[in-house]
């Protein structure tokens, strides 16, 4: 039996639309992500468990884990009879890389079960392909950090899909999921087909400056450059209370904030534990909309997807 855990991730990070993402893990030790178990069997089966299992498609072939198994078998050129279990702990359409968690855990578990026939680069390419079936286009800003850990910059040149960017140990990521769903496809459809020249220049300046600040170890500058001129001005209308929440967390002391992925999760970066706790308390009282919502104080998950049992 192989059991693999794949962590939540926060894509875009305001400054890097479709090219930047970070894996995150709660500081209290909770596992924020999906778990997939693979066992040898006579025929294929898939069982769904976990807090958000009831939100999965009722038709098994529409389940992304089934599609991962099917695509992996195709890659190896043979049928692999296994019993798979998906522990769906991540809300769907949350902006926390929910589909990436399932895809990464499923493909990594299959690869481990079969003795690692695929290298990490090929595996990551498959992960991007499968996750793209749900989000509508291939982009690696969730699957890369989820699989490899840390903060990842998408390269997609010279056979390099992504490379790690150094983060800051003092940064605490407060993630508030309000309990409503925003589909990635819907959030992409709301974006303009073309952008003004000054917005393109500002975006390039912010992203280049952010990467420079990370490598030159300037956390204050890095946080100051986490601005989004590409998606947030258009997507915030999909998120009730988002603008007020951003203003409130800034007043409490967050050094940066924005939409996690395509939303509705809000992220707020803090550089002090007491500030992070106050931000989390405010968001828990004011940004959450129902019982499915939650707030976690997180750090970068530098390990990425990992085998829990083998």
Curated annotation (Swiss-Prot):
Q: Which domain of life is it from?
A: Bacteria
Which GO-annotated molecular functions does the record name? ATP binding; homoserine kinase activity
Q: Which InterPro entries match?
A: GHMP_kinase_C_dom (IPR013750), GHMP_kinase_C_sf (IPR036554), GHMP_kinase_N_dom (IPR006204), GHMP_knse_ATP-bd_CS (IPR006203), Homoserine_kinase (IPR000870), Ribosomal_Su5_D2-typ_SF (IPR020568), Ribsml_uS5_D2-typ_fold_subgr (IPR014721)
**EC numbers, comma separated:** 2.7.1.39
For whether the record's keyword set contains Cell membrane, the answer is no
Top-level EC class? transferase
Cite the binding residues for ATP. 91-101
- Which UniProt keywords are given for this protein, alphabetically ordered? Amino-acid biosynthesis, ATP-binding, Cytoplasm, Kinase, Nucleotide-binding, Threonine biosynthesis, Transferase
User: Main location per UniProt?
Assistant: cytoplasm
Q: Which reaction does it catalyse?
A: L-homoserine + ATP = O-phospho-L-homoserine + ADP + H(+)
Which GO biological process annotations does it have? threonine biosynthetic process
Q: Which GO terms describe its cellular component?
A: cytoplasm
As for subcellular location, the record says: Cytoplasm
Q: In which pathway does it act?
A: Amino-acid biosynthesis; L-threonine biosynthesis; L-threonine from L-aspartate: step 4/5
Q: Which NCBIfam families match?
A: PRK01212.1-4, thrB
Role, per record? Catalyzes the ATP-dependent phosphorylation of L-homoserine to L-homoserine phosphate.
UniProt family annotation = Belongs to the GHMP kinase family. Homoserine kinase subfamily.
Q: What is this protein called?
A: Homoserine kinase
């Amino acid at each position: 039996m192989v059991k693999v855990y794949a962590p939540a991730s926060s894509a875009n990070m305001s400054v890097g639309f479709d090219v930047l993402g970070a894996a995150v893990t709660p500081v209290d030790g909770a596992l924020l992500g999906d778990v997939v178990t693979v066992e040898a069997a006579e025929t294929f089966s898939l069982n769904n468990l976990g807090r958000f299992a009831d939100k999965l498609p009722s038709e098994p072939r529409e389940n992304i884990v089934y599609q991962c198994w099917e695509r992996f078998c195709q890659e190896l050129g043979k049928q692999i009879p296994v019993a798979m279990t998906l522990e769906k702990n991540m809300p769907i359409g949350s902006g926390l890389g929910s589909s990436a968690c399932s895809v990464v855990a499923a493909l990594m578990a299959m690869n481990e079960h079969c003795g690692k026939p695929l290298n990490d680069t090929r595996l990551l390419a498959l992960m991007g392909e499968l996750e793209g079936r749900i989000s509508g286009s291939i982009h690696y800003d969730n699957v890369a950090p989820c699989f490899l850990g840390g903060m990842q910059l998408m390269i997609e040149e010279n056979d390099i899909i992504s490379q790690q960017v150094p983060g800051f140990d003092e940064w605490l990521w407060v993630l508030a999921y309000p309990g409503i769903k925003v589909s990635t496809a819907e959030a992409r459809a709301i974006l303009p087909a073309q952008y003004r020249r000054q917005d393109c220049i500002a975006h390039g300046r912010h992203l280049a400056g952010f990467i420079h600040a990370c490598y030159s170890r300037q956390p204050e500058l890095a946080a100051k450059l986490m601005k989004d001129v590409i998606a947030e001005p258009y997507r915030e209308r999909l998120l009730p209370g988002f603008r007020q929440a951003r203003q409130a967390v800034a007043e409490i002391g967050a050094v940066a904030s924005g939409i996690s992925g395509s939303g509705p999760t809000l992220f707020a970066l803090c550089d002090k534990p007491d500030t992070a706790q106050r931000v989390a308390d405010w968001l828990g009282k004011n940004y959450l909309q129902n019982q499915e919502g939650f707030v976690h104080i997180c750090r970068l998950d530098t390990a990425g997807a990992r085998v829990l049992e083998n």
